[in-house]
Amino acid sequence: MLEGEAYLEDCLRIDAFGKLDVIPAGRVPETHLELLASPEFSELVDLLKSRYDRVVIDLAPVQAVSDAIVVGKHADSAIYVIKSDSTPLPVVRRGIDRLQEVGINVAGAVISQVDLNKISSYGGDY
């Protein structure tokens, strides 16, 4: 879509309940970072913000590539996702600091892939 090969309406996928629209990444070109930094991407984000209550962009880890830094500048806020039992606290702190250093508002964090057997005593009857 950012390369001019498709229209937004052609890329949208709607869930079975009609409550969630998704734009899959599709083919990721070698120049994907240039596309994410392009005026076309900025215009796409602005268009999506005008059409939807929430726009969520799922990106690679901030430590791995610069995608989150480039795209995060278009976001009102970021949610930092931490893989349970995998991501050391110093790495989490560096990642959050890196986002904040470039002016990205980190609204919070989510811990993913939690092994509920390890925390069976927590939460009671939830």
Walk through the language-model features, giving the residues of each.
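P-loop NTP-binding module
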Residues: 1-126
